[in-house]
Amino acid sequence: KIPNPGGVNLITPNHLQETVFAIETDGKLYVSNSMTFVLVASGSKLIKKYKAYVADMGSILYGLKSDKLVKQSPLCNGRTLQYFRCCIAEIYRDLQIKEKTRYSGLEFSDFSDYKQKLIDILEAINNNATDKTRKMPYGMIGTISRGYDAPSVCALARYVGCSEVFTFVDNADDDGTEIANILGYTTIHRVNSKEYKSNERLLEAEAFASGETDPVFINFEDLYRNKLLLLGERGDSVYERLHSNANNDFDFHVGNQLSQASQTIFENMLKNNSIVIAVPLIGGDRWTDLKRISNSEDMKPFSIGEHYDRPISRRLLEEAGVKREMFGQRKYGGGISYSLDTFGRMRSKMSVKSFEALKGYRKMFPKFLWSDLCYKTKFYWVNRSIYLNYICSKLHLKQAFKGTGNDVGMLANPNATMMLCWGVELMKERYKDKY
């Protein structure tokens, strides 16, 4: 219960990477940065018939002011799961809540101003994290590739003493080892992104319990345990010179695509005492400043004049000694997604043990024939151009199908709620002895 007459303030991070969850029941408000934990603590359950949990969590990509931003989802017995993001929530003794948006308060005049402010903020974060009075001081690690965002973050991180990175090497063209050496990193872990497929720890369940659909990253949890994990998340938006959607409200949605990337790996981060620092999102609520800087006269020498053009990232790296042709030449993806897969196709993207466990759970999961059929019909119709173009690519035909042109809202994979419930059921074992 609220412990003092004045109530309390709930202050979330001022970025998209973390959500605070809350459930009110029997005159109490349960709050946690773990969805599974708050469900266990409050004795609440997900509604297995409800298809939109993952889409509700992903709706943050519409931005803080959109009417499509979902702030709560239904639970069993008339309860609701509340989402608090980028806000200060004033919670009163009667459990009434007054919420206001939390912005960074930053402004950027030019590249030098932006770079220095990022360095200052990273240094302050690192000083706090490594303070000797902490019971467990944090280390620091980054990820690196031959793209734009991850290596430019690593270039900044060197200013605050980061010396450790990991890179995927199964695609030689995206191996960031050479860039890491140039930047002065002394500990470089070279890993294979496909290693997760041999895991027997049911890592996929841990990812699904967070509303995430990509277990590739968390397979390397041993590398970032008890560390700050520096990522280039959303650099593909805020650093892209020609991006058409620059705004200051964290609106990162692209059509109806549900692409949450690393913003929902909280169960894994909590387990490993790790903190994600998505560097491009520091001041990401000043995206218009960053676009103006990217298109400024001073940045023209660092613009390649193409659609894949991120002058801020390029300048950070080239001024650190990385040659132009070594990075940002082609866009690669480091993860996987189940967002458009049928259940059968998921087999090739999961470890054998995890898929068999999920298949067993699916057999016991209740079937809702009519609502399932209606939802699947809508899902495949809205995404029909993607599937038709995929078929054309397999037949070596021209991909000519375009999207609907209508933003109907984000739709999660028809199996998403089942996958989420499976993950939550397994994660409950982690917390059940607490209550």
Residue positions per predicted region:
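Generic recognition of stable, solvent-exposed alpha-helical segments in well-folded globular domains
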Residues: 120, 148, 152, 171-175, ...
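C-terminal non-catalytic accessory extensions
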Residues: 399-435
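Short glycine-rich phosphate-binding loop at a beta-alpha junction
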Residues: 139-142, 228-232, 317
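Hydrophobic (often cysteine-bearing) scaffold residues that line and stabilize catalytic clefts
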Residues: 114-122, 209, 213, 305, ...
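Phosphoinositide system proteins, centered on phosphoinositide phosphatases
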Residues: 384-385, 394, 400-403
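ATP-dependent adenylate-handling ligase core
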Residues: 171-228, 233-260, 264-276, 290-303
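Mid-to-C-terminal catalytic subdomains of enzymes
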Residues: 264-390
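Cysteine-centered catalytic environments shared across enzyme families
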Residues: 1-195
